[in-house]
Amino acid sequence: MDFTYSEEQQMLADSLRRFVASEYTFEKRRRNAREHGAFDRRIWSALAEMGVLGLGIPAEHGGFGEGPASQVVVQRELGRALVQEPVIPGAVIAGAVLSHYAPAALQSQWLPAIASGERVFALAYLEAATRYRLDAAQASATPSANHGYVIDGVKSTVWHGGAADMYLVSAKLDGALALFLVQRDAPGVSVTPYPTIDRLAGADLALDKTPATLVTADGLAALEFGIDHGIAAQCAAAAGAMERLIEITAEYLGARKQFGKPLASFQALQHRMAEMLMHNELALSMAYVAAQGLDAADPEERRRKVSAAKVITARAARFVGQQAVQLHGGMGMTDELEVGDYFKALTMTDVLLGDTDLHMERYCGAMAA
């Protein structure tokens, strides 16, 4: 598989790397988290100006219409810096769902707002009893004479839900899963944000006869499509984070001395670093496999490639994160080193957008189809 960037992709990667080197140093990332939580409006606007938020949105709606391969380039750079803003749920997932499943009027209304950074979207599909099952939603939607539809239910672990002002919400409509748009300031909306272990944020979303706009009655297909785009982006971001963590670890082993020699000179540690690099390369390869799957005409092929990428990337992320902590010794357990931030982010790779058990089952189902 050829990972060579096109000229435009290389320019985009270079500009993003310069941006995060300036705005996302370890100290600035920690300060932003303290002052702004997991969302800094200034950074969000800058990402919009650089074309990150509109990358996959059609040009007629203010975006650039780039394909999944370009998204891998972008997410790899954002992952290297552990960028905290909700690019994946707010732009990648929401943009994919609205671009392919929303009626033309909703596309014209909301896609330009995503590309410009004017609106921040979040995906509210998980519930306490669903265990990642997309079609097991207990939230329900009913027609309303005044508002089109109203939704009742509670959504949990909404990724970046506290920063969002718009929600894509799954709910049962006439017994089938549908997807709706809900505005944060709509009547009956209650948002309870909380921090997650990776210094990001989740939220619980309670809806009590909340007015909603129908995006599509084919909610299961739309939800799967959007989440698969999010997983491909997540795999690329994890590969970028692993890449940077390996660099940090190599720098530490080169500087730290034991028995009068740098730790990097010990062959056993060199072998462990080589294993970390192999896992990182495998994860990057699988990010491109997932990106290829997004273009597949057959949904089963898409499911197979995306779920395989998710499982392998999650395993690689855990391995690289754990090895980095161990190679840093006792310092790896402290909060003062950025290795801990990378470890936490990589650990979350397994549980975001479906865990390994779910995707192993999904992969096997796609293989049998």
Residue ranges and their predicted role:
Residues 1-82, 101-106, 113, 117, ...:
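Alpha-helical interface subdomain recognition
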